[in-house]
Amino acid sequence: MALAPTSSAISGSLRSSMLKLLMRLKSRTLATRLRLYEIIIEMQELGITRNEREIFYMDVNVFRTQSVVRRLVSSIASELQISKHDLGVRNTLKGIFIGRLGFVRHHGLGMVEMSSKGGCPQLIPDMSDIAEVLCDYKKTVVVEKDTVLQRIASEIEREKCLEEILFVCGKGYPCKNTVLLLKMIEHKTAVAGLFDLDPFGIHIFCIYKYGSKETPDIRVETIMRIGVCMEDVLEKNAYKDVFVKLNVHDLKMINRLVRFGELSADLLFLRKIDGKVEMEALFSKEPRRLRYFLFRMLERISS
């Protein structure tokens, strides 16, 4: 097993790369990369870690967007043939859950039990520090949006059977940390997901199931999509008022995703009707509507 690189070795490699870059023509990309080198060298020398969001806010004017930081960090790690963890870059934490889980730390550092109370979600801890997740739930439901998770949380008080389900939310496109949690428990629990019936909601499902470009190996292969589906909005034409017209970005995303056979029917349906449905619109009119759809969709989970 190869030895982990030392901080001084990483700093030395980055300084060498900086000198090479300085010999090239100046550009915004060059300035951005040099600023990131400077930050990572400082982190290595001080023995501190940061996540990509923290790095981004250290120099917003240079980095412009958080995705620039993410791409450059991945590029640097690839060039040096080391992991982001070796660079001192932690996972960005944004995923949350409602339920109770035990997190066993690496290197025998003990176990921490975390549970949500009063319907208040818990932040998923940094999974790079976790060796195992203790999960007693037979069913886990991934919810695309935290606004919908909040609605579900209010139903848990009324419907005690929902306490038997672990709810996880990646707040839109999931961070690596959220997917890592699900990957660690997918063989202990049936994992299902609730997503908008729109091209980008379906794309978010694909990120969970098939991985992203940056992390293709981090995926939840067993996750099933239980809603919102075409049949949910076709009932006696009762919900035709919830559709929003597709835009050019939606149409481009449909063309990208139709190659996934299991998703093509819903995608072609959206293109045919030139519309999409967000969960908030589908559930918002009556309190009973959320309860009705939620239990209907939960019945689709394979036990």
From Swiss-Prot:
Q: Where is the active site?
A: Y57 (o-(5'-phospho-dna)-tyrosine intermediate)
> Do you know which Gene3D superfamilies this protein is assigned to?
3.40.1360.10, Winged helix-like DNA-binding domain superfamily/Winged helix DNA-binding domain (1.10.10.10)
Look up and give the organism this protein is from: Encephalitozoon cuniculi (strain GB-M1) (Microsporidian parasite)
RNA-binding found in the keyword field: no
Q: Does the keyword DNA-binding apply?
A: yes
- Family according to the record: Belongs to the TOP6A family.
Q: Which GO terms describe its cellular component?
A: nuclear chromosome
Which of this chain's residues are annotated to bind Mg(2+)? E144, D196
> E.C. number, please?
5.6.2.2
Keywords carried by this UniProt record: DNA-binding, Isomerase, Magnesium, Meiosis, Metal-binding, Nucleus, Sporulation, Topoisomerase
Cofactor(s) needed by this chain: Mg(2+)
Subcellular localization, as worded in the UniProt entry = Nucleus
Give one Pfam family: TP6A_N
Q: What name goes with this protein?
A: Probable meiosis-specific protein SPO11 homolog
Query: Which stretches make up the Topo IIA-type catalytic domain?
Result: 1-96
SUPFAM superfamilies found in the cross-reference section? DNA topoisomerase IV, alpha subunit
